[in-house]
C-alpha cells in the first residue's frame, strides 16, 4: 500500500502563519512532532524530532536530520511544535524548545482547536512571556520568544519523568499518566510483584 500523506490542518495553519506574519523561514529550524510532510517542502533543511520510529523514518527519507534527543547546545533560530493532546506534555515541550533557541529566536506552536488550541495562548503565556497568535483552519498558532530560565526549568520538570504516590514512574503524555488505569490495577492484583 503506498504511503498517503495525512490531512493536517495544523500544517496548513503553520504555513498560513509563515505567509501572513512574515516569519523568517531561513536559518536553523527544528520541527517537533511534525505530523504532515507538507512542512518538509517549506522547511527542507529543518532538523526533526519525533519519538515514533515510523515518523522519524519518513522525515529521514525526505533528507531531514532526525534528532534522537533534544540537546541544549544545539541552538535553533526557529522551533515549530505540532502540539500533542496532553497539556503538561505540550507545556514541557514548549519550555524545552525555548531552552534550545538562539538569542532572538522564536518558538511557534500549533494545535487543533479540539486538542488544546483554544487554550494555547494561555499555556505559552504561563511561562511569563507575551505571545502573538492567530486562528486559521480550526487551529491556533501561537509564537513567542524565550522565557526566563526558571520558567523553562519548572515546566520542563513538570513534563518529565515523575514518581507517583503509589511508587510508579510516569510521565505526562503517557496513557493514564496521572492515575492507575484499570488494566494495570487488575494485573497488580493477579501477578507477582517480583
Question: Which functions belong to the PLM regions below?
Answer:
Residues 119-139:
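Conserved Class I S-adenosyl-L-methionine
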Residues 90-106:
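A short glycine-rich, Lys/Arg-flanked "PGG" loop and its adjoining helix->strand segment in the class I
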